[in-house]
Structure formats: C-alpha cells, structure tokens
C-alpha cells in the first residue's frame, strides 16, 4: 500500500461526523469507566469541507494515531469526538473538538474537568506556520503565535500544555497566511503528509512515556528514510 493510498484509507475509515452539536461533558457517560492518564487533542475544524486543509493537520494526526493503535470508535463527548485507547500501556483519550478552531479550548476544558486532569496531562497537536512543511517538533508551554486554536486552549486551561507542532511552512507574506492555512494540501504533497502522519503515529509511544526528545529524533529518522 503506497503512502498516498494509506492516507486515502485513513480518511475513508474515519467515523462519520453526525450533524448537530456533539454531546457536552454532562452527557459524557459515553466514556464508561475509562480513566485516561493523558488527554491528546487534535486541533482542526469539523466538516468535510475542512478535512484536507493545512489548518486541520492536528485532526489528521489524531486520526492517524487512533487508527494505528487500534483505538475504540469515536464517541460524541465534550463538544467533540473522543476515542479511547492505549499506547505503550498508557491510557489515552484522543479528542477532536467540534467547536470550530476559535472555541477549541472549551472542549479541552470539559474533558479535563470530567476526568480531573491537570494542564500537564494535555498534549495538543496543531499546524505550525513557523516550521518547515512536514517537520515535527515538541515544546512545553509557550505562546500562541496567532493560532486561534492555541489561543482558545490557553484561555481555558493556561499555557503549560505540551504541543506537538506539525510544520506546514509559511507562505512568505503575512497577507497570504489565512488563505494558505485554510488551503487544501496539494496532491503532490500527499506522500509527504502521509509519511509525517505515519511517523507521528508510529513513534507515539515515546510521547506517552514523556520522552519528547526520543519522539522527535525517531520521527526525524523515519522521515529522513522516506526521502
């Protein structure tokens, strides 16, 4: 299976997004007795028209991790879609807020409150303008660099959460940024996109263990081997 075909399979396998507002925290009985150690959040906008935009690569990463590690099907909860699973023995809740990017933090806060987790238990996967396309870096805390999803998350939970920065590059002109981040990945970029998502999913156990340096190193090695 080629990387391009793998990416298509990933998107074809995603659970259908049910129209209407997803369930909020009080309706989170969908989670059953699951008690995650960590909450991993993919940032993006809900709906098919946004699915392949650069701004949605956080959603893509969450889907890739869930599919690669055999997470349970998505359930409506916390104003988003949540999937339960384990990575390297660590219980993880993968969350895709369905609140649209500008209000992502509300969904994250709801999940944190429900499971009584701290900001240090949260990892956010997001698109990063200030990183070359398909490069991956991890940092703890920091600013928002104008990213509305990060800004909303910070407003609701503070800024000391871990970020997995998924490089999309910069168009070179600040006036072109909005059109660029809301633009779809080109067909010619699909193999590189699939390679990045596959590497992030394959090395996710290092994130679960808190070894960010090893995660970044092994992802970089995988991507170098794919060049």
Regions found by a protein language model. Give the residues of each.
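Nucleotide and nucleotide-moiety/phosphate-recognizing core
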Residues: 2-141, 151-164, 171-176, 191-226
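Short glycine-enriched, charge-decorated loop/helix-capping segments at active-site entrances
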Residues: 137-143, 181-185
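Hydrophobic alpha-helical segments within soluble ligand-binding/sensing domains
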Residues: 145-149
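Short, loop-centered acidic/histidine patches that primarily coordinate divalent metals
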Residues: 166-169, 185
């Amino acid at each position: 299976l080629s990387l391009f075909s793998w990416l298509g399979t990933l998107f074809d396998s995603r659970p259908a997004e049910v129209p209407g507002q997803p369930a909020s925290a009080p309706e989170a009985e969908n989670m059953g007795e699951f008690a995650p150690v960590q909450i991993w959040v993919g940032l993006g906008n809900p709906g098919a028209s946004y699915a392949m935009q650069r701004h949605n690569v956080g959603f893509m990463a969450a889907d890739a991790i869930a599919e690669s590690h055999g997470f349970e099907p998505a359930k409506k909860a916390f104003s988003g879609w949540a999937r339960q699973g384990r990575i390297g023995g660590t219980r993880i809740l993968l969350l895709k807020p369905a609140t649209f990017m500008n209000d992502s933090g509300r969904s994250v806060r709801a999940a944190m409150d429900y499971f009584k987790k701290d900001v240090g238990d949260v990892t956010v996967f997001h698109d990063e303008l200030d990183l070359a396309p398909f490069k991956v870096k991890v940092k703890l805390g920091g600013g928002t660099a104008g990213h509305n999803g990060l800004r909303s998350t910070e407003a609701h939970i503070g800024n000391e959460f871990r970020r997995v920065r998924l490089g999309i590059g910069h168009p070179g002109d600040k006036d072109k940024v909005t059109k660029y981040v809301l633009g779809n990945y080109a067909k010619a970029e699909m193999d590189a996109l699939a390679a990045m998502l596959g590497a992030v999913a394959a090395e996710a156990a290092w994130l679960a263990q808190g070894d960010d340096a090893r995660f970044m190193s092994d992802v970089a090695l995988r991507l170098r081997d794919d060049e």
